[in-house]
Amino acid sequence: MVVIVDTISNPLRPRHPEKVNRPDSASPPKPDWIRVRAPNTRGYADTRNIVRANGLHTVCEEAGCPNIGECWDKKHATFMIMGDTCTRACAFCNVKTGLPNALDADEPQNVAEAVAKLGLAHVVITSVDRDDLADGGAEHFAQTIRAIRAACPSTTIEILTPDFLRKEGALEVVVAARPDVFNHNLETVPSRYLTVRPGARYFHSIRLLQRVKELDASIFTKSGIMVGLGEERHEVQQVMDDLRSADVDFLTIGQYLQPTRKHHAVMRYVPPDEFSSYEKVAYTKGFLMVSASPLTRSSHHAGEDFARLKAARAAHAR
């Protein structure tokens, strides 16, 4: 069977076989405000070497993040645990789909060692969806959090989780490990779920974020969406309201970028001034923090944003 090949990784490997028979989806040319420089700095190379030496995966590489050069130059990386293969096939995502391998029992400790080597004050841990596991990987998340706490007590920990759909008790396991920030992305507006995120349920994700606050109100909650997928402005504003009803603290909004022609097309490149408008509206709805720009991604500037988030909570409490 013909497969889409990841031409970045070495050796080349099959990727997105489920998308092979889809027709190509053409996107408009990228505007100037989207373009970024290719990564080639010493800091970038050092970060890559540490990731490789510890046998780890990062969402920076797997998802083709446009900010990888900037972040890795500063030795900031978002570690992706539980392998590099996802059990879902979202139309926007560049992470490969298939049957994942068994969990690596050494991974939590390997991640903790990499965090120590990079000297991270704030680390972001995400994962693929693991619908094949009874708990969706919740205990592995918890073990990773605990390993980082033991190795780097002063490092703050942000997690970006899957939705643990139909995994009873999984969320409670993760929250009990007490990450500093719990992020779960809605990704898009409800009307686009069928074509963009068919394996997920919008209101399940809203409820998951709300439940985190019910379990531990001290944990910051965060969520993000992409724009440029065919949504309307009023739908984005409704997402803001839904997230605030779940007491979510931090909202990110970024431009969707098409990984390959087999993925969902970019319907529109949203101009920077429209992102600024979204940010202003979101603040009026009560979010402690909002980041909205074409290149905003969940983990971009996460450390700096965490410091600002704490300051905003303290100011709000006064």
From Swiss-Prot:
Recorded metabolic or biological pathway in which this protein acts: Protein modification; protein lipoylation via endogenous pathway; protein N(6)-(lipoyl)lysine from octanoyl-[acyl-carrier-protein]: step 2/2
This protein's name: Lipoyl synthase 1
Pfam families tied to this protein: Radical_SAM
Sequence segments annotated as region (Disordered): 6-32
UniProt catalytic activity: [[Fe-S] cluster scaffold protein carrying a second [4Fe-4S](2+) cluster] + N(6)-octanoyl-L-lysyl-[protein] + 2 oxidized [2Fe-2S]-[ferredoxin] + 2 S-adenosyl-L-methionine + 4 H(+) = [[Fe-S] cluster scaffold protein] + N(6)-[(R)-dihydrolipoyl]-L-lysyl-[protein] + 4 Fe(3+) + 2 hydrogen sulfide + 2 5'-deoxyadenosine + 2 L-methionine + 2 reduced [2Fe-2S]-[ferredoxin]
Keyword Ribosomal protein belongs to the record: no
Signal sequence residues: none
GO molecular function, one term: 4 iron, 4 sulfur cluster binding
Keyword annotations: 4Fe-4S, Cytoplasm, Iron, Iron-sulfur, Metal-binding, S-adenosyl-L-methionine, Transferase
Origin: domain of life: Bacteria
Domain Radical SAM core: 72-288
The protein's Enzyme Commission number: 2.8.1.8
One Gene Ontology cellular component annotation held by this UniProt entry: cytoplasm
Cofactor: [4Fe-4S] cluster
Stored Gene3D superfamilies: Aldolase class I
Record localization: Cytoplasm
